[in-house]
Curated annotation (Swiss-Prot):
Subcellular location: Cytoplasm; Nucleus; Chromosome, Telomere
Domain Protein kinase: 20-267
Pfam families: Pkinase
Biological role stated in the UniProt entry: Component of the EKC/KEOPS complex that is required for the formation of a threonylcarbamoyl group on adenosine at position 37 (t(6)A37) in tRNAs that read codons beginning with adenine. The complex is probably involved in the transfer of the threonylcarbamoyl moiety of threonylcarbamoyl-AMP (TC-AMP) to the N6 group of A37. BUD32 has ATPase activity in the context of the EKC/KEOPS complex and likely plays a supporting role to the catalytic subunit KAE1. The EKC/KEOPS complex also promotes both telomere uncapping and telomere elongation.
Stated name of the protein: EKC/KEOPS complex subunit BUD32
Enzyme Commission code: 3.6.-.-, 2.7.11.1
Binding sites annotated in the UniProt record for ATP: I26, T27, Q28, G29, A30, E31, G32, R33, L34, K49
UniProt key word Nucleus: yes
Species the sequence originates in: Chaetomium globosum (strain ATCC 6205 / CBS 148.51 / DSM 1962 / NBRC 6347 / NRRL 1970)
One of the GO biological process terms: tRNA processing
One Gene Ontology term, aspect cellular component: chromosome, telomeric region
Length: 267
């Protein structure tokens, strides 16, 4: 199947040059592919996001949409990176060719880290018992809340906040030489939280948009980590302490929750 896909949608030309490190396909979705390769030198890993042409769309329209979406994502990432939000740095891009090269984030998804941490705890009930404030999982929730607070403070909403779109990068990791950090074993909830996959991100100062961002994460968290659902309140507290306009966002969040419950009741 992969070979057939490669024949139909070959990698972008930038990955076929003789000096390029052979790329590794990491993920493939309806809208694009993510490859792991290198940037400038063979010991500097990077991620290359590629949006191949869509045969079902008119070529001119497809080219315009691809260019607009990649350019928008790059602008959002650059804005976040300048403001100190933990996101991948953009190294290079060619919107006309449909690709963007970014910093490779070493580590594991937050989703994996939380589930591994929960897997080490006995399942005595539907939820984990109350945990102490200083436990690693609580500290992780605080770091996630702070990262989202920094994102919203910058005037950006992610659009698809889930624990799969967050990485735990080992502290002390050097992206230039690939030197390992202090952590990184699977299942650890230690490390720096890095937000990834900004394909649906927009620039917005709206409390409503920010509240929807949080609601999407809250629903995804409850679905993916039901035993740790009560810890989401810790995330919101950290968000509030990081972002001074959070109070009005959290009020809007209550409205969004109410609308969500009504939709659930109506089917």
């Amino acid at each position: 199947m992969a070979a057939a896909d490669d024949a139909q949608f070959p990698p972008p030309k930038v990955l076929t040059y003789p000096a390029s490190t052979p790329p590794t396909l990491i993920t493939q979705g309806a809208e694009g592919r993510l490859y792991k390769t290198t940037h400038l030198t063979r010991d500097r890993p990077c991620a290359l996001k590629y949006r191949p042409p869509k045969p079902y769309r008119h070529p001119v329209l497809d080219a315009r949409l691809t260019k607009a979406r990649l350019s928008s994502e790059a602008k959002v990432l650059e804005r976040c990176w300048r403001e100190g939000v933990p996101v991948p740095a953009v190294y290079a891009m060619d919107p006309a060719a449909g690709w963007m090269m970014m910093e490779w984030i070493e580590g594991i998804p937050v989703r994996v880290g939380i589930n591994e941490w929960l897997g080490d705890r006995p399942e005595e009930g539907a939820e984990i018992p109350q945990v102490a404030d200083e436990t690693p999982i609580v500290d992780l929730m605080k770091r996630i809340g702070a990262a989202i607070g920094a994102l919203h403070k910058t005037g950006v909403v992610h659009g698809d906040l889930t624990t799969s779109n967050m990485m735990l990068r080992p502290r002390g990791f050097n992206p230039v030489d690939g030197a390992p950090g202090d952590e990184g074993k699977a299942g650890s909830v230690e490390g720096d939280v890095v937000l990834i996959d900004f394909g649906l991100a927009t620039q917005s100062m709206s409390d409503e948009d920010r509240a929807v961002d949080l609601y999407v994460l809250e629903r995804a968290f409850a679905s993916t980590h039901p035993r740790a659902e009560r810890l989401f309140a810790t995330l919101l507290e950290s968000y509030k302490s990081t972002f001074k306009k959070a109070s009005s966002v959290l009020i809007k969040l209550e409205d969004v929750r109410m609308r969500g419950r009504k939709r659930s009741m109506l089917g």
